[in-house]
Amino acid sequence: MALLRDVSLQDPRDRFELLQRVGAGTYGDVYKARDTVTSELAAVKIVKLDPGDDISSLQQEITILRECRHPNVVAYIGSYLRNDRLWICMEFCGGGSLQEIYHATGPLEERQIAYVCREALKGLHHLHSQGKIHRDIKGANLLLTLQGDVKLADFGVSGELTASVAKRRSFIGTPYWMAPEVAAVERKGGYNELCDVWALGITAIELGELQPPLFHLHPMRALMLMSKSSFQPPKLRDKTRWTQNFHHFLKLALTKNPKKRPTAEKLLQHPFTTQQLPRALLTQLLDKASDPHLGTPSPEDCELETYDMFPDTIHSRGQHGPAERTPSEIQFHQVKFGAPRRKETDPLNEPWEEEWTLLGKEELSGSLLQSVQEALEERSLTIRSASEFQELDSPDDTMGTIKRAPFLGPLPTDPPAEEPLSSPPGTLPPPPSGPNSSPLLPTAWATMKQREDPERSSCHGLPPTPKVHMGACFSKVFNGCPLRIHAAVTWIHPVTRDQFLVVGAEEGIYTLNLHELHEDTLEKLISHRCSWLYCVNNVLLSLSGKSTHIWAHDLPGLFEQRRLQQQVPLSIPTNRLTQRIIPRRFALSTKIPDTKGCLQCRVVRNPYTGATFLLAALPTSLLLLQWYEPLQKFLLLKNFSSPLPSPAGMLEPLVLDGKELPQVCVGAEGPEGPGCRVLFHVLPLEAGLTPDILIPPEGIPGSAQQVIQVDRDTILVSFERCVRIVNMQGEPTATLAPELTFDFPIETVVCLQDSVLAFWSHGMQGRSLDTNEVTQEITDETRIFRVLGAHRDIILESIPTDNPEAHSNLYILTGHQSTY
């Protein structure tokens, strides 16, 4: 490891006392510390260095901080290298970042934005006069002191302009704030300090609208749009809310041609920044941020249909009255099942939260430095070589910065006009070959991180048993449920490790702690009608509201909010609390844009690339969104304006080797007979949709009811009374039984480890995947059964046959050791 210049080798612990962790910078964690020499507070970034690490970026940050002394740039105190840990010590800004502040207060007022722009421009003017570029201006990198000063921070990706290198040629920054010439650097040949002016203009919009333009798009799609010659600079959405001075200031700062874009010095002379702007504007903002009751309500919540009158808690009838066992419940304990089979196209396990708590929530002592070192070793916080793509994994900067990436892979492009819109019915398109079959999106941008998760068997909930053949059975978890349930999933809390059943119903979203079945209580989580649920990385997706948008809910946050509400009784109804005091961008439930009127959706993972997609079928279009790990959310990747042949019909994503995007199966058919081929009707998303694809009418003989991709080359196709097992071309498989036959009309099929479980209105039957022999069977003419969920765990509902309006019983297939 090369030696760093201007770095002391003395022990930094002799001067600085660490107090608490406050965030993460570009390459390391940041701590609040006390300077024992001056008794003042300081910010200390600690980075673990390993042999062979590229330290050029760290050296750049130290050099820029040391050389740039200005009131609007965080002051540099010193750097220390001790035991392979680099300490960069800077001025502490107690007000936090502007991103943190607007999350608490909502949008800034125009004069507050003007004040921030003026102070930031002063810092940029000084930086540019020294021949340096910041390259990562955004709300998260503008810090405030408690006195209302604005400081430029985080110079981890900054660059220096020299006489020999008049323009930077590296692709660096944060996508949504990136200037067009930076997005197209490989084609246009470079950029200069004016990219910071563009980023400040985007930041001004961010402060007024709580997010930068194009934020609903996947970052790579946003970059692709910005690099096009037809790209138009963004504007404020609400023209009437803001003054003409603000609009004109943004027009200048966001001038597309950098040769015509004004400098920071020139913009300091604009009327928007020369108006009377006292420091009190920012101190008032800080006061507001410290008082959450001054937050603004979320207008999105007004669109949700709520059930205020339905109880917050529902007790199982087993506690408060006799619970008679039905014939099927007796059979449930006699018939054993194999574990549910994990589909290769299911998203990976939820990554458990890293065991790294915010220091300061606990009593601090002399062992803090030891805990810092242990945590650094546990996290393996290292700097990769410059040739590697830097993964966006900072938990505190929710607008991830690209560090250094000489090559990001090809951007998604629009399909050429001459490309065929669909494949002939019957086969999935062949995988591409040749040099043009490179990945659409780099996996570092989009994939969920594969971490070594503890086994789900260690969770607190329904007890697992060893992995034995046929060791599971259905267990009743709730008796007499009054909810009109549409969907259900299971989820494990990342902190308590308790397992929960989450149900989506007409009356809202409720949870049941499977670790506390002696309580037998369903608790309301969200008071909005819900027709579909899916859980990804502790984010609960739901189809909710009067006009059925897709919503994303932060499950750990909602559970914590409910816990606090139960501790401190409020007069405000629990479902209205977020509308009263939590700003829109800080809400625990957020609406995914452009999904109004969604009829159905599916989640699928490409096992070849690791990318996870969300398909949303709307009445007149189909949306394809991709999971973006740094933001823990789905972002729009493509919008197909052509309507599906039947938006409410079959919608099953299929993943093919060599294809980045999933194929959408909208129908399947096949003549009777175990050796017959199944014909798939697929829409290849790379090419777009075709409006006149031939789909067999629903209900006719030979049309499939359900299609399930079990692994990379195996598909289950469910017909009225049989299940075919075929490969991706629709041909019967050679190793498994080509057809499983049933003597009842199939409603739902679920694939177990060695059998297929088919459900019908009065029971279920399992048949071996190898021999077609019956492996399990339960029949109860007195009950009507319905599968509520089959992702990870099978959740079943039953109601009396003679009284369909009666309360239902809920069951979960348990006793197996989950394969997830």
From Swiss-Prot:
<keyword id="KW-0723">Serine/threonine-protein kinase</keyword>
<dbReference type="InterPro" id="IPR011009">
    <property type="entry name" value="Kinase-like_dom_sf"/>
</dbReference>
<dbReference type="GO" id="GO:0016323">
    <property type="term" value="C:basolateral plasma membrane"/>
</dbReference>
<keyword id="KW-0832">Ubl conjugation</keyword>
<comment type="similarity">
    <text>Belongs to the protein kinase superfamily. STE Ser/Thr protein kinase family. STE20 subfamily.</text>
</comment>
<feature type="region of interest" description="PEST3">
    <location>
        <begin position="405"/>
        <end position="448"/>
    </location>
</feature>
<keyword id="KW-0808">Transferase</keyword>
<dbReference type="GO" id="GO:0006903">
    <property type="term" value="P:vesicle targeting"/>
</dbReference>
<dbReference type="InterPro" id="IPR000719">
    <property type="entry name" value="Prot_kinase_dom"/>
</dbReference>
<feature type="compositionally biased region" description="Pro residues">
    <location>
        <begin position="422"/>
        <end position="434"/>
    </location>
</feature>
<keyword id="KW-0547">Nucleotide-binding</keyword>
<dbReference type="GO" id="GO:0008349">
    <property type="term" value="F:MAP kinase kinase kinase kinase activity"/>
</dbReference>
<dbReference type="Pfam" id="PF00069">
    <property type="entry name" value="Pkinase"/>
</dbReference>
<dbReference type="GO" id="GO:0106310">
    <property type="term" value="F:protein serine kinase activity"/>
</dbReference>
<keyword id="KW-0597">Phosphoprotein</keyword>
<feature type="modified residue" description="Phosphoserine">
    <location>
        <position position="394"/>
    </location>
</feature>
<comment type="subunit">
    <text>Interacts with TRAF2, TRAF6, MAP3K1/MEKK1 and MAP3K11/MLK3. Interacts with RAB8A.</text>
</comment>
<feature type="region of interest" description="PEST2">
    <location>
        <begin position="344"/>
        <end position="360"/>
    </location>
</feature>
<feature type="active site" description="Proton acceptor">
    <location>
        <position position="136"/>
    </location>
</feature>
<dbReference type="GO" id="GO:0043507">
    <property type="term" value="P:positive regulation of JUN kinase activity"/>
</dbReference>
<feature type="region of interest" description="Disordered">
    <location>
        <begin position="387"/>
        <end position="442"/>
    </location>
</feature>
<keyword id="KW-1003">Cell membrane</keyword>
<feature type="binding site">
    <location>
        <position position="45"/>
    </location>
    <ligand>
        <name>ATP</name>
    </ligand>
</feature>
<dbReference type="GO" id="GO:0004674">
    <property type="term" value="F:protein serine/threonine kinase activity"/>
</dbReference>
<feature type="domain" description="CNH">
    <location>
        <begin position="482"/>
        <end position="793"/>
    </location>
</feature>
<dbReference type="InterPro" id="IPR050629">
    <property type="entry name" value="STE20/SPS1-PAK"/>
</dbReference>
<keyword id="KW-0333">Golgi apparatus</keyword>
<dbReference type="Pfam" id="PF00780">
    <property type="entry name" value="CNH"/>
</dbReference>
<dbReference type="GO" id="GO:0005524">
    <property type="term" value="F:ATP binding"/>
</dbReference>
<dbReference type="GO" id="GO:0035556">
    <property type="term" value="P:intracellular signal transduction"/>
</dbReference>
<protein>
    <recommendedName>
        <fullName>Mitogen-activated protein kinase kinase kinase kinase 2</fullName>
        <ecNumber>2.7.11.1</ecNumber>
    </recommendedName>
</protein>
<comment type="function">
    <text>Serine/threonine-protein kinase which acts as an essential component of the MAP kinase signal transduction pathway. Acts as a MAPK kinase kinase kinase (MAP4K) and is an upstream activator of the stress-activated protein kinase/c-Jun N-terminal kinase (SAP/JNK) signaling pathway and to a lesser extent of the p38 MAPKs signaling pathway. Required for the efficient activation of JNKs by TRAF6-dependent stimuli, including pathogen-associated molecular patterns (PAMPs) such as polyinosine-polycytidine (poly(IC)), lipopolysaccharides (LPS), lipid A, peptidoglycan (PGN), or bacterial flagellin.</text>
</comment>
<dbReference type="GO" id="GO:0007254">
    <property type="term" value="P:JNK cascade"/>
</dbReference>
<keyword id="KW-0963">Cytoplasm</keyword>
<dbReference type="GO" id="GO:0006468">
    <property type="term" value="P:protein phosphorylation"/>
</dbReference>
<keyword id="KW-0067">ATP-binding</keyword>
<dbReference type="InterPro" id="IPR021160">
    <property type="entry name" value="MAPKKKK"/>
</dbReference>
<keyword id="KW-0391">Immunity</keyword>
<dbReference type="GO" id="GO:0046330">
    <property type="term" value="P:positive regulation of JNK cascade"/>
</dbReference>
<dbReference type="InterPro" id="IPR001180">
    <property type="entry name" value="CNH_dom"/>
</dbReference>
<dbReference type="InterPro" id="IPR017441">
    <property type="entry name" value="Protein_kinase_ATP_BS"/>
</dbReference>
<dbReference type="GO" id="GO:0000139">
    <property type="term" value="C:Golgi membrane"/>
</dbReference>
